Amino acid sequence: MVDYTDLRASLYVPANHPKLVSGMFESNGTQAPSYILCTEDSLSDSEVPLALRQVSSLLPKLAKRNGAAPVFLRPRNVDLLREFLNMDGIENITGFVIPKADVDTLPSYADLLVGRPYRIMPVLETRSIFDERGRTELREYLNRSPLGPAVLALRIGGNDLLKLLGLKRQPGISIYQTPLGTLIPQLMMCFRPHGYQLTGVVCDSLDDADLLRREAQMD
């Protein structure tokens, strides 16, 4: 059984990455503690077919990684989730990261996932998350939905939330120095007392070790 602490610092990888398959089987000590293979906003529409071919090639091989890092797929939409679920070897992944998760979008994903053995990580990255009522409605939906027990953690979509504010992360600036620095504690107070863990916002400046260190301390 995977625990949310097993995620540690998840590595987002575009599913069309040329080393998607080979990189996950390297034995030189560079493997990530967990992987999220993304087919959503890291790809353009024209890049999706290659991404699907690579995922289809990778899935059966994951059976050889017993005890290895958890692997999640981030589908672009419900149609791609359906396609993933029909692929050979899909049982070898840990679960799915659900983009743009709110009370309007989650029911369609639930229709496909309830009753299956996958863990899910909804991403909080829509306009409703800024509103207290929107956060409460999402929490109550998860509490009563059969999908709720499958939630491993809630992810905070920092870049998308900043985009909704007309902002963009700047080099050297921590997410906690942006308006999201006041939103993140509100998310914690809304969800964590009810048993829902939250992950830290992805730090996309991997070449800035000081920034990564500061964000990890705040997380």
Which stretches of residues belong to each language-model region?
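Expand to "…catalyze enediolate/carbanion chemistry for C-C bond making/breaking, isomerization
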Residues: 1-219
